[in-house]
Regions:
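Conserved beta-alpha
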Residues: 88-176
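N-terminal nucleotide/polyanion-binding subdomain common to many enzyme families
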Residues: 2-112
């Protein structure tokens, strides 16, 4: 039995928080919500206690399996856990599980557009973007003029430095925001989201959404739609950034198939 399978069955009272409808798959919780439902929930959370959203893909699943004691509680503490991978969804379908696909990039584009439209005659929603270069701030403000946009660049290699992650979390605490978009990669963004709660963040929603803002602003090119639908977005991204992504897509992420088969064997399927 895998370490993650054992840990996932233990109670996590200090981290666990009730989520809207969810299932367990590959050792992680996944919310059974469509994108439109997620946006509705987010927009209805004004004044609610602080909470965060994770968007696990194949790489996230593998990363959590590598460090279950460290990372699994972080994903379990999330308010929502949205499937951001067509490969993960395909594996779920193979197991006859109705797992919706809600990619971080599509979610953020739709969420900001919705907030921009609904905030036209109300107090503008304050959006803090952590990670990208400050140059994207002007682009976002031009596209979403009815939102208050604040971009906070973050250093690289946050995944290897607990001190740097805590410094970023403290910097977020010193800003005023309703929604924070954490765009610093897995697992740094999820750990920072959890740290915000530990530091006493009272309200707001943090979304862990990787490179979504880079795609949205054109800083990075997203795969053509047909490539996305074919489940080959990873190949497109690899072709664009081979030095940075070759290990993730060719060595680490494919391990999800072994994880899937191990989980099926444990369930007796």
């Amino acid at each position: 039995m895998s370490p993650l399978s054992i840990i996932s069955r233990r109670p996590q009272p200090q981290f666990r928080r009730r989520q809207p409808r969810h299932i367990e798959f590959l050792g992680l919780p996944f919310s059974l919500l469509q994108q439109v439902e997620v946006i509705r929930l987010i927009t209805e959370q004004g004044g609610a206690p602080y909470r965060y959203i994770v968007t696990p893909n194949a790489y996230h699943v593998v990363t959590v399996h590598d460090e279950p004691k460290w990372l699994l509680p972080v994903y379990r503490a999330a308010w929502l856990s949205l499937c951001d991978s067509r490969i993960v969804r395909a594996l779920a379908r193979f197991d006859r599980l109705p797992l919706p696909l809600v990619t971080g990039s599509d979610l953020i584009a739709a969420l900001l557009a919705t907030l921009n439209a609904t905030d036209r005659n109300h107090t503008p929603r304050r959006i803090l973007v952590i990670g990208p270069q400050r140059a994207v701030e002007g682009v976002l403000r031009a596209v979403y003029p009815n939102l208050t946009i604040d971009v906070m660049p973050a250093p690289g290699a946050l995944g290897q430095s607990a001190d740097m992650r805590r410094a970023v979390a403290r910097a977020c605490m010193n800003r005023t925001w309703d929604i924070a978009l954490l765009c610093v990669g897995c697992p740094a963004q999820e750990l920072i989201a959890q740290q915000l709660g530990e530091l006493g963040c009272k309200s707001g929603i943090a979304l862990c959404v990787g490179a979504s803002i880079d795609f949205l602003t054109g800083a990075s090119s997203r795969a053509p739609l047909w490539t996305q639908k074919a489940g080959l977005e990873w190949a497109y991204r690899l072709s664009r950034e081979p030095r940075r992504l070759w290990r993730r897509y060719l060595i680490e992420s494919p391990r999800i198939f072994r994880i899937f088969m191990t989980e099926r064997a444990l369930r007796g399927r």
